[in-house]
Amino acid sequence: MKLLLHLLAVALSVSPYAHGQVTVQSGLAHRIERLPGQQEIVPIKLKNVGDQPCAFHIELADLSSHCDSGYRYPPPGSTDASCANWLEAETYDHVLRAHEEMIVKVRMRIPKGFNESSARACLLVTSKPEKEADKKGPRLNIELRYAVNVLYRNPMVPPVVAMEAKALAVGGDNAVWALRYQNAGNVDRIISSRAHLLNDQGEVVYQTESLHAKGLIPNQCRTVQFNKPDLPAGDYQMVVVSQTDAGEKFGVTHSLKL
């Protein structure tokens, strides 16, 4: 499974030998849709991929985004949409032997009276090698932090779904066209898109799927990319139809000249 790693802090130099390093082997985004008052177990699979023992530390944080700033991890409970205090890990600190694997169970307890459409938090998993590198020679001194996002959707409250097109880049010598969206709603969504290109007679002369589906939390901006077609020069109408993982659809149109 291909993982998208949020590497928050990395310091490294060359080393002739391997050290301990704990990595997250499970997904980095967990979407939960349970009724208020219910519970859910989030399993976090960890593995020490190094040849020496390695410790890890789990820390709770809030999760937010402000368009181009990317993810932010403020202190737990500091944002309005926080569910950090719903989460409890069975352990927060542990040492794994070389190549040892472990599943840490994180319990989510959803309050009975919760009446918002969504909430979110983050588990920051930091790998801390047990032994310091030899100070006399080249060093490998790595501290990796993985951000495991926990995204809750309340099935009892209708969400506000609003994806705003911020920019469309179709010119230049780029091999792809890029459409930038911002999630202006109040719930996370995964979007996939299909682009249709119509000529001046209204005929569809090209259509393609977006290269990758994109997940967006509220206020986050993501770019959807399409392979650029090889078409004759002329006037065209581009129609992009997008769909969320919950089935909502929305579209964008744009006139362009090739």
Report residues per predicted region.
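Buried hydrophobic-core signal for structured, non-transmembrane domains
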Residues: 42-48, 99, 106-108, 121-125, ...
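Beta-sheet-dominated interaction scaffolds and their linkers
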Residues: 19-54, 93-94, 161-178
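Short solvent-exposed strand-capping/beta-turn motif centered on an Asx-Ser/Thr pair
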Residues: 47-52, 63, 182-188, 245
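N-terminal signal peptide c-region/cleavage motif recognized by signal peptidases
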Residues: 13-15
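Terminal connector regions
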Residues: 52-66, 109-152, 232-258
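Beta-strand-rich interaction surfaces with strong enrichment in secreted/lumenal proteins
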Residues: 30-33, 90-96, 210-215, 227-229
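Short Pro-Gly-centered flexible turn/kink motifs
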Residues: 40-42, 94-107, 217-226
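Surface-exposed binding patches on compact interaction domains or structured appendages
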Residues: 22-26, 51-105, 192-195, 199-204
